[in-house]
Structures are given as C-alpha cells and as structure tokens.
C-alpha cells in the first residue's frame, strides 16, 4: 500500500535522487556553474540554510594555570572546591587572568623566601648540633684525662691503654667487667645444695666426678673454659634438681658435651662421651639429659666463671713486670683449678677466687715483695683483707694439708708444658701477710 505525497509533505525531500545529492558534494567550478544555470539548476548555497550552533572558542592550555591556582590556595589554606568556580567560569578567569598571574608570582616569591628561612634555620640547628657534639667530645676527653690523672696519682697502671688491638676491647673493657661482676651474683649456684636439695650424693662424690672430668678434658685437649663451664652447669643443675648417684656421671658427661659445643672449635661427639663412660650410658640417654639440662638453665650458657676473671687479673698482675712472667700465669691457673673439685669453695664468688689465685701465685714466686698493689686492687676490686679467707683455704689446697688422693689437676700441671708449677710452694706461709 502506497501513501500519497499530500499526506506526507516531506516525502519529496526524502525521495530526492541520489544524483542530486551527489552533485551537491561535487566541487563547483565556473564552467559547471554556467552549465547549471543554463539548465535552470540552482547553485548550492555557500552557507547552510539551517541555523548552526555558535562556534566554540579555541581550547587554551589552562592546566598549568589551574594547577598553580590550586597549589597556591592549598598553601594558603584555601579550599579546592571553591577554586573549581574559576574553572567553570572561563570569562571571569580570563578577566582576572592578569591578577591571578601576579598572585602566583607573589606566592612563588613568598614560598621561596619561606624555604630560604627554613633552610637557614636547619643550617643553624646543624651548626649547634656540631658544636654541642664537639663540646661533649671535649668533655669526655677531659673526663678521660682526669681519670688517667687519678690513676697516675694512685699508681695504677692502665692495662687498657692498648687501643690498637681490637681483640682487647680496650674502649669497652671496664663496662664489660662491670656487667660481669653483676652477672656472677645473679647466676651463681647455691653454696649449700648438698644439704638442701641432694639426698643421694655427697661432696666426695662430686669431687670424684670433677677430678675425672679434669682428666677427660686434658686427654681431649679441651680449653680451660670448657672445664669451668662444665662444673658451673653441674652445680647449677644440682642446686635445684634432685639426682640419684647412678646418674651423676651421666650428668657430668652431658654437661661437658654442652660446654664443648659452646666453647670448642671442634667438640667431641656424643659417641665419644658414651665411650669414656665404658658405654654405661647410651646415646639417647646422653641426649635426653642434655635437653633436660638446657631447659633447666634456660639455655643461659654465657656465665662468668673464675677463668673469666682470671684472664684480666693476670693481665693486671703482669703489668708490674717488664717481661711477662709465664710461671705466674700457669701457677694462678693451677691454683684456680684446684678449687673446682672442692665443694666448700662454692661459698666464694668466682672473681674472689681468681683474685686470690693471683695473690697466692705472686707470693709463691716472690716473698720479697707484697703480692698486692694498687693496680691489682683497682682491677680486681678487692682489698687485701677481703682476700684472707679465700687465700688461706687455697693455700691448704696447694699444700694438700688434707691428704687428698685425687691428683688429676696436680698431674696436669706437673707436666713440662706448664713449667711443673704444681711442685712450687712458698717457704713462708701466707698468713704472715694478714697478721700485719
């Protein structure tokens, strides 16, 4: 069904031939215009017959301007939302463009001046810090000089003056030994655990065990620190844990296993410690006891022993000799190790035992001069009167007044490599020094 053109007034417009439409898009030259006028065809208008929208203005680069405006407002504490009005109203922004540009320049100048002021303040603060640190360094230097002056006045030799050797820890030695003196009070075993805790063992059993461990440590060429730590672990464990006599040797080898792992470069294996007990204890038993000991001491193996203090005290004693006196070191170590087997020496602090060993060793080697001097008193922190009981008890061990038959320590220090210092005794008793 077809509709008439009268019913659709725009039908003629819709049914325009494609040729006419295409001709409207052909370029109009002068010759084509004459031909078209001759045929009665109207030339297409140069301007559109319908109303067009107003041409938009050319886009301008406003990104920097808007960013500078927002940044400056932010620095002033303004609101970004308020600045969006400037972006929505280009006419007003165009009118005030010059003013905003001037404001931006002013803000930039202000910010530069603020930055310069802040930089100057920072530099002044740094200069003050440098001057303060220099003042502190000078104050510390003055204190050190004052301290050295006091030591010279007291005739104390500075054994920490060798700052070139990093192993000496000269700068920290005093602080280190301050902490060690505190630690020996906190981690010492009970002096009467045989009476309070143990019921199946006695001091003689402990003496036999430790004398045997001295022999084991010498056979395996273990360092003295291993032996001292072994005895320390034994006493700490026995101070709070009951043990039967059948397991006392198991405790000893397990403690030496732990100490060897902690102190030695190459520790003996578990099988070695089982072997030295004639396989009385199996590997699982030794490992089980090792775990029990470590849990009991909470894995605190870094403890001050007599050997810890003995190194420093011997160094202080050697300061009075032009050439190091090797017999003094061997003899002091011998006297200190004699105390390991004696349960009664638990009542003395390790530092006191070390100081007494140096005192008695110096007296044994030379009776013409008093064994104590300001340097030893300064570094050991003990006066002569405080050493009396320990030195007298140690002299009894040296002379073996009790007739003890356990001689592992004596045989060890009778060897030529230790200058046979176990044979040395003093012709004069040390009691004469305390009666003055």
Curated annotation (Swiss-Prot):
One of its GO terms (biological process) is positive regulation of stomatal complex development. The keyword Cell cycle applies. It comes from Arabidopsis thaliana. Expressed in roots, stems, leaves, flowers and siliques. This is Cyclin-A2-2. Keywords: Cell cycle, Cell division, Cyclin. PANTHER family: CYCLINS (PTHR10177). GO terms for molecular function: cyclin-dependent protein serine/threonine kinase regulator activity. Belongs to the cyclin family. Cyclin AB subfamily. The keyword Cell division applies. SMART domains: CYCLIN, Cyclin_C.
